[in-house]
From Swiss-Prot:
One of its GO terms (biological process) is DNA-templated transcription. One of its GO terms (molecular function) is ribonucleoside binding. It catalyses: RNA(n) + a ribonucleoside 5'-triphosphate = RNA(n+1) + diphosphate. Keywords: DNA-directed RNA polymerase, Nucleotidyltransferase, Transcription, Transferase. The keyword DNA damage does not apply. It comes from Trichodesmium erythraeum (strain IMS101). Gene3D superfamilies: 2.40.50.100, 2.40.50.150, 3.90.1100.10, DNA-directed RNA polymerase, beta subunit, external 1 domain, DNA-directed RNA polymerase, subunit 2, domain 6, RNA polymerase alpha subunit dimerisation domain, RNA polymerase Rpb2, domain 2. PROSITE patterns: RNA_POL_BETA. Its EC number is 2.7.7.6. DNA-dependent RNA polymerase catalyzes the transcription of DNA into RNA using the four ribonucleoside triphosphates as substrates. The keyword Lipid biosynthesis does not apply. In cyanobacteria the RNAP catalytic core is composed of 2 alpha, 1 beta, 1 beta', 1 gamma and 1 omega subunit. When a sigma factor is associated with the core the holoenzyme is formed, which can initiate transcription. This is DNA-directed RNA polymerase subunit beta. InterPro entries: DNA-dir_RNA_pol_bsu_ext_1_sf (IPR042107), DNA-dir_RNA_pol_bsu_external_1 (IPR019462), DNA-dir_RNA_pol_su2 (IPR015712), DNA-dir_RNAP_su2_dom (IPR007120), DNA-dir_RNAP_su2_hyb_sf (IPR037033), RNA_pol_bsu_bac (IPR010243), RNA_pol_bsu_CS (IPR007121), RNA_pol_bsu_protrusion (IPR007644).
Length: 1102
């Protein structure tokens, strides 16, 4: 079946509000960092004075410079270096005594630059900085019930950095304060210590009589007494002083270096407490403290409201720029200490700014952030969608955030304020559920870090779609009635119907159209990019939609991408914003095209070259490849797509293939979600993907001399070297299989490495046998493929190598993987399964016109999982296949009328039947079902079957990467049991429960073998191997090593444990004898080597 689809029929009369650039969040944040964040940080540390105050070092931050990066993006990837710029800051050193001023530009460190795709290249690997969602600084009020059942309130003042301040009331109507979670002291003490008199305190409170109780209970404090009391509480055990108290209070809350509310904190405080302090006041003031106590007391009188900490108005997003700024602060902190020390130690005449400023602490801080922070992640590059989603991810984990163990249900749960901001569907399954989310489609992050979402205004029940949408934060929309994007309107935008569902004050209710204030701009505004690529999403259960969203990110790019027959209309934007397709920057004419570059000449006659990426390896070992879409002489406009990337076709995202599916059981081969497929999918390379793996070896300098990359490898015949060049490196284009040598390497070997026979030869003849050992890079078990690239890096060529390495060789092996039994495939609706059998085409069920089915799915996978969207997709795809059209259906289509999905699908199927003249395509009696014939017998099945075209993806969980076997292999040092896992060439663990199963069956000998000779009886297993090689009977097992370890552990606890056996003596009496369980322990710790004697000599002796 060939699918030549040309005309696209978009069924949806919705003019979607254009989606913003999807990775704007990354770019805008980094731009902010370069323009403001870095300058702000440097300014906050300038000037740095020494302890005497004689010397001052000023950073003139606004004039900082970035030098050109050393290598381009491509070159950085090739050389395993970072794509970074050097930062230079003009500095001024002022000597107060002599009045001398020295100015210099000082290097302060390397700053990794963001590529235009929103990623960073660190040591040759693309990384993404994930956005973090944290509690916003500000003041939070909470009500609690104490032991006596009385409601009390507390207020927490949380800064960006610095000490927390917590006020609380108790059952006796007293007001207390805690500083940084220490012991509580009376609020009066804090206020008096700030130098406030009774009159000032009472004037600023709405209910001064409430606070009067606190003063009466505690008695009056003067300012000095209060300071002493404060010092006693915060520093118990030290003699209190008034100066000490003042200094303590000032440094905790009023010192800019130690306490910072941040712009956000100030904004939130002003909003909540109705203050008018300027944005520049980033420390606490007396007004803040008084106002927060006032609000707290008002709560006791039911004035004001408590805060919900999971509300998105109280959580903010920290993107790259801010996370990097925080890290630079850490570096500058260390730098400041170093500068102070140097100022004190050195002679002031000889000092220059360059000698003072050491870039190391800043470089280390930046390196640590990009290299090992929890939020700096290896980019998921499986396909363009995975890449895009990774950059829009929002995590509550990481430094300053939550931890998995401590996060409860409330934090993970969907909150009404998530609407249009964070996707309620896309989140991982497992321990991170709800802690990691994805930004919704139209969401933006504002300058304070709060997520905003756009709405159209509504006047008198009419939606003003011609106006610019208004972006709103979560707290701005709390008191408004907001309707969803899929309500029915007429051509003028008037809302139809009498009842409209709205969100109002964190609640989902209904109202009449006149009361509606705003309407969402699009039905897919609620969900993320991946979720909005699922057609008929509204017919799927949320759990399955979640799996569908997550599995689209795991789809492997296929050899011949095929865009879906049934899509949602967001595919082009997802492809374009992922950065995988090549987009023109100017209008013009294509002057040159080949597979590696496209040139465009603009109106002014300037030529722009667009290089294409050919068969590059991605982070996940999939293949990145671009193919031109334009021809020489074509006219192009700015923003037009010139070339497709991997998993895109015709500038649209194409993650899978359109295949003919039938929902029917077939001989039990699709039991429990297994999937039966036709051989056509193998022969026609429908699901064939290319995977490129990288193998690396370095030649190091050892104590005994340098390692050598060479062809001269001991004990390897010419056959093993046939594909190596004269240097001993494999040639490009060679086909290799497991065990083949990729790079020959020999390592010098010391005296101790020599076997006894070699020592003997040397003793007799005094000659040196060639003392090197083979340490070559070989193809690992179960791998095969073709060499596509070889890169050699040496010191001589000026490459940067790891310390101790003289030469690094990198070999890239490409494999073509056809689909096979054991591979995982899935649809977009969370319907996943493993391929259980590949049937010959002639055995597959076929349609009345003889077309064989491609994939047979189990119908029982639908009802209990409630992902009915797959049925709609499958039938609409069937209509599209016959009519040769594609459909774009935006999810949530009931705004076009009730039951719209079903109506449309039926309409299109009827149209397909009438246009094709094949009556069997749509049967009114069983709509959507077709009589299907058994390919083996030619008989018709006993009932009609749902058949259609579904879009199925092949996922990255390939059986080739998982299959594994072990005969002999490495053992763990302590327990002497085989290691686990494919990477360690490990065994299959026969665990506690499996042992119970064998015990239940009484399979004693099998069990004994499993626990001894197949596992950790060291002597027994060597003897058993020997016996197997020689064809003898397997000897009796000994004591397992792990049992001996247990005995030793018990003995180390001073428990004398011994085993006794009862023996009968000659005179018929019995006595017990102690058995030494350690007896069979050989003298050496290492197991004796099995002795391989040839079987023939054995036979001759008999």
């Amino acid at each position: 079946m060939t699918y030549q689809k040309l005309n696209v029929n978009t069924y949806s009369n919705l003019q979607i509000f254009n989606m913003p650039d999807l990775i704007e969040i990354q770019r805008a944040s980094f731009r902010w960092f370069l323009e403001y964040g870095l300058i702000e940080e440097l300014d906050s540390y300038s000037p740095i004075t020494d302890y005497t105050g004689k010397l001052e070092l000023h950073f003139i931050a606004k004039n900082y410079k970035l030098k050109q990066p050393k290598y381009s993006v491509e070159e950085s990837k090739r050389r395993d270096s970072s794509y970074a710029v050097q930062m230079y800051v003009p500095t001024r050193l002022i000597n107060k005594e002599t009045g001398e001023i020295k100015e210099q530009e000082v290097f302060i460190g390397d700053l990794p630059l963001m590529t235009d795709r929103g990623t960073f290249i660190i040591n040759g690997a693309e990384r993404v900085i994930v956005n973090q969602i944290v509690r916003s600084p500000g003041v939070y009020y909470k009500s609690e019930t104490d032991k006596s059942g009385r409601r009390t309130y507390n207020a927490s003042l949380i800064p960006n950095r610095g000490a927390w301040l917590k006020f609380e009331t108790d059952k006796n109507d007293l007001v207390w304060v805690r500083i940084d979670k220490t012991r509580k002291l009376s609020a009066q003490v804090l206020l008096k210590a700030l130098g406030l008199g009774d009159s000032e305190i009472f004037d600023s409170l709405r209910h001064p009589d409430y606070f009067q109780k606190t003063i009466e209970k505690e008695g009056q404090y003067g300012e000095e007494e209060a300071l002493l009391e404060l010092y006693r509480k915060l520093r118990p055990g030290e003699p209190p002083t008034i100066a000490g108290g003042e200094q303590l209070l000032h440094s905790r809350f009023f010192d800019q270096k130690r306490y910072d509310l941040g712009q956000v904190g100030r904004y939130k405080l002003n909003n909540k407490l109705r203050l008018n302090l300027p944005n520049t006041v980033r420390v606490l003031t007396k007004e803040d403290i008084l106002a927060s106590i006032d609000y707290l007391i008002n709560l006791e009188y039911d004035i004001g409201q408590t805060d919900d900490i999971d509300h998105l108005g109280n959580r903010r997003v920290r993107s790259v720029g801010e996370l990097l700024q925080n890290q630079i602060r850490v570096g500058l902190n260390r730098l400041e200490r170093i500068i102070r020390e140097r100022m004190t130690v050195s002679e002031s005449e000889t000092l220059t700014p360059t000698s003072l400023v050491n870039p190391k602490p800043l470089v280390a801080a930046i390196k640590e952030f990009f290299g090992s922070s929890q939020l700096s992640q290896f980019m998921d590059q499986t396909n363009p969608l995975a890449e895009l989603t990774h950059k829009r991810r929002i995590s509550a984990l990481g430094p300053g955030g939550l931890t998995r163990e401590r996060a409860g249900f409330a934090v993970r749960d969907i909150h009404p304020s998530h609407y249009g901001r964070i996707c309620p569907i896309e989140t991982p399954e497992g321990p991170n559920a709800g802690l990691i989310g994805s930004l919704a489609n139209h969401a933006k992050v504002n300058s304070y870090g709060f997520i905003e979402t756009p709405y159209y205004p509504v006047e008198n029940g009419r939606v003003l779609r011609d106006r610019t949408p208004i972006y709103m934060t979560a707290d701005a929309e709390d008191d408004l009635r907001v309707a969803p994007g899929d309500i029915m309107t007429d051509a003028e935008g008037k809302i139809l119907g009498d009842v409209v569902p709205v969100r109002y004050r964190q609640d989902f209710t209904t109202t009449n159209p006149q009361q509606v204030d705003y309407v969402a701009v699009s039905p897919v505004q609620v969900v993320s990019v991946a979720t909005s690529l699922i057609p008929f999403l509204e017919h799927d259960d949320a759990n399955r939609a979640l799996m569908g969203s997550n599995m689209q990110r795991q789809a492997v790019p296929l050899l011949n991408p095929d865009r879906p027959l049934v899509g949602t209309g967001l595919e082009p934007q997802a492809a374009r914003d992922s950065g995988m397709v090549v987009v023109t920057r100017t209008d013009g004419e294509v002057s040159y095209v080949d597979s590696t570059k496209i040139s465009v000449i603009d109106k002014e006659g300037n030529q722009a070259d667009y290089p294409l990426c050919k068969y590059q390896r991605s982070n996940q070992d999939t293949c990145l490849n671009q193919r031109p879409l334009v021809f020489e002489g074509d006219q192009v406009v700015a923003g037009q797509v010139l070339a497709d990337g991997s998993s895109t076709e015709g500038a649209e995202l194409a993650l899978g293939q359109n295949v003919l599916v039938a929902y029917m059981p077939w001989e039990g081969y699709n039991y429990e979600d297994a999937i039966l497929i036709s051989e056509r999918l193998v022969y026609d390379d429908v699901y064939t993907s290319i995977h490129i793996e990288k193998f690396e070896i370095e030649a190091r300098q050892t104590k005994l001399g340098p390692e050598e990359i060479t062809r001269e490898i001991p004990n390897v015949g010419e056959d093993g070297l046939r594909n190596l060049d004269e240097q001993g490196i494999i040639r490009v284009g060679a086909w290799v299989q497991s065990g083949d040598i990729l790079v020959g390497k020999v390592t010098p070997k010391g005296e101790s490495d020599q076997p006894p026979e070699e020592k003997l030869l040397r003793a007799i003849f005094g000659e040196k046998a060639r003392d090197v050992r083979d340490n070559s890079l070989r193809v690992p078990n179960g791998e095969k493929g073709r060499i596509v690239d070889v890169r050699v890096f040496t010191r001589e060529k000026g490459d940067e190598l790891p310390p101790g390495a003289n030469m690094v060789v990198r070999v890239y092996v490409a494999q073509k993987r056809k689909i096979q039994v054991g591979d995982k495939v899935a649809g977009r609706h969370g319907n996943k399964g493993i391929i259980s059998r590949i049937l010959p085409i002639e055995d597959m069920p076929y349609l009345p016109d003889g077309t064989p089915i491609d994939v047979v799915l189990n119908p029982l996978g639908v009802p209990s999982r409630m992902n009915v969207g797959q049925i709609f997709e499958c039938l609409l795809g069937w209509a599209g296949e016959i009519l040769s059209v594609r459909f774009k259906c935006v999810p949530f289509d009931e705004m076009h009328g009730p039951e719209k999905s079903r109506e449309t699908v039926h309409l299109m199927l009827k149209l397909a039947r009438d246009n094709s003249g094949k009556d069997w395509v749509f049967d009114e009696k069983h709509p959507g079902k077709i009589w299907v014939f058994d390919g083996r017998t030619g008989e018709r099945f006993d009932r009609p079957v749902t058949v259609g075209i579904a879009y199925m993806l092949k996922l990255v969980h390939l059986v080739d990467d998982k299959i594994h076997a072990r005969s002999t292999g490495p053992y763990s040092l302590v327990t002497q049991q085989p290691l686990g896992g494919k990477a360690q060439q490990g065994g299959q663990r026969f665990g506690e429960m499996e042992v119970w199963a064998l015990e239940a069956f009484g399979a004693a000998y099998t069990l004994q073998e499993l626990l001894t000779v197949k596992s950790d009886d060291m002597q027994g297993r060597n003897e058993a191997l020997n016996a197997i090689v020689k064809g003898k009977a397997i000897p009796r097992p000994g004591t397992p090593e792990s049992f001996k370890v247990l005995m030793r552990e018990l003995q180390s606890l001073c428990l004398d444990i011994a085993a006794h056996k009862v023996e009968t003596v000659d005179d018929g009496t019995t006595q017990d004898v102690e058995v030494d369980l350690m007896a069979d322990l050989p003298g050496k710790r290492t197991p004796s080597r099995p002795i391989y004697e040839s079987l023939s000599t054995e036979g001759n002796q008999d």
